[in-house]
Amino acid sequence: MVLGNTRVSLMIEDNCLFCMIVKGQLPSYKIWEDENYLAILDIFPNIKGQTVVMPKKHLDSDAFALSDKELTDFMIATKKVANLLVTRLDVARVHVVFEGMHTDHLHSKLYPAIGLSRETKQAIAPEKIYFEEYPSYVTTLEGPRAKDEDLKRLQVTIVGFRKRNKNKENSD
């Protein structure tokens, strides 16, 4: 279903975990709220203070399918919560992820960088990982050094695709 430029899932409210939380039908640990958005502590955190920010209105989990205004409003709400975490948890930064694979309701996940020095330092994990296909989760671990010829081929694929789409848009 499309509402404006935004896809709205037909899994409306009755079966949506986040809609039930917004309605107060499921318990949550609310840390911030305004008229349109809600932020709760994640009950499955991998770091203290991990937070989920969600719109109160049920929207498809693909953040980049939103209209520019909807995405901007959502990012502003996410930023407000990130700033709250920075201040209250006394952290240098908060990292944000839009994945939306587990729950089909638009949301961002915030990860307070507890223990990160306020001075910028290069931190590289010793382990490397690479996936041929998306494994249904996100990691920021680096992979092995990609081959230049593979990167060049991928660059041509992406740039060529973009140019073809621009030409198609201009012909419509």
Positions of the model-derived regions?
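HIT superfamily nucleotide-processing domains
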Residues: 2-172
